[in-house]
Regions:
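Cys/His-rich Zn2+-binding cysteine-cluster or related metal-binding knuckle/ribbon modules and their
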Residues: 210
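Short secondary-structure boundary segments
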Residues: 183, 206, 228-229
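Short, charged, intrinsically disordered terminal tails
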Residues: 228-247
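Cytosolic regulatory modules rich in charged/polar residues
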Residues: 205-206, 224, 241
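Acidic/glycine-rich phosphate/pyrophosphate-binding loops and surrounding catalytic core
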Residues: 1-174, 178, 187-195, 201-203, ...
Length: 247
């Protein structure tokens, strides 16, 4: 059989994530595929950079290349966007992801968030309870919704969505771990932090460009929760080039 070397080259600036996953795509077909010159996870790479070289049977490399690139481009896109937000935060506010991930790929996408410098929020519903507007609507008010959660499981940390400052007060009154601010202006977020006085962590759920993260950090909120880092990250352009017979 013909042997060859395949090289993955990135076409745009990125933060690398998922090279081990890409490697496994090739090794699922042939465990003897050899990897050389692999870049580190989390490394910034410039256009034209070689991410890794794969040596093995040409048929193996050609069969797996599409799947390998799909994973690598997707995960690198998430890590790159996350790094943009993390860098913009200057370490003054923690960038969180959400559970809004691709079905069956949550573990990998949350891994890419960590590589990019973000922090995973909840992986599953058993990690904590987020009391949202629908829960409050069904229970009647925030206090009753929280009471029902605690009656079911007193150990789980509780986070409550707050759409108004009155919601913030109600959540603080029942002693939840985190208040998630939803859709309030900067001054209202600042006021929520003031009212909290350390009794609960303040998280801000926002769809803002990364250049506005310093403004959120200035409010004193501990977290910014950004669904876009997994929902809106664009795959990073890469190519897979066969460069000739492997030695």
């Amino acid at each position: 059989e013909v042997r060859a070397t395949g090289v993955i080259v990135v076409n745009t600036p990125c933060v690398l994530a998922g090279l081990d996953v890409a490697t496994e795509c090739f090794r699922q077909l042939d465990p003897h595929v050899v990897v050389d010159g692999a870049r580190r996870e989390g490394e910034r790479c410039e256009p034209g950079a070689e991410l890794a070289r794969f040596r093995g049977f040409a048929a193996t490399l050609l069969t797996a290349e599409g799947t390998a690139l799909n994973f690598l481009q997707r995960l690198t896109g998430i890590a790159t966007l996350t790094r943009d937000f993390a860098d913009a935060s200057g370490g003054r506010i923690t960038v969180l992801d959400t559970r809004k991930t691709t079905p069956t790929l949550r573990a990998l996408e949350k891994y890419a968030v960590r590589v990019g410098g973000g922090v995973n929020h909840r992986v599953g519903l058993d990690d904590g309870v987020l009391v949202g507007a629908n829960h409050v609507r069904m229970a009647g008010d925030i206090a009753e919704a929280v009471r029902r959660v605690r009656a079911s499981d007193a150990e789980l940390p509780i986070e409550v969505e707050a759409h108004t400052l009155a919601d913030v007060d109600a959540a603080l009154a029942v002693g939840v771990a985190t208040v998630r601010i939803q859709g309030l202006p900067i001054e209202a977020i600042r006021e929520a932090v003031r009212r909290s006085r350390g009794r609960a962590k303040i998280s801000v759920s926002h769809t803002v460009p990364h250049d506005r993260i310093p403004e959120l950090a200035d409010t004193g909120a501990e977290y910014v929760s950004i669904a876009a880092i997994t929902q809106a990250a664009s795959p990073v352009a890469m190519t897979f080039e066969l460069t000739g017979a492997a030695s």
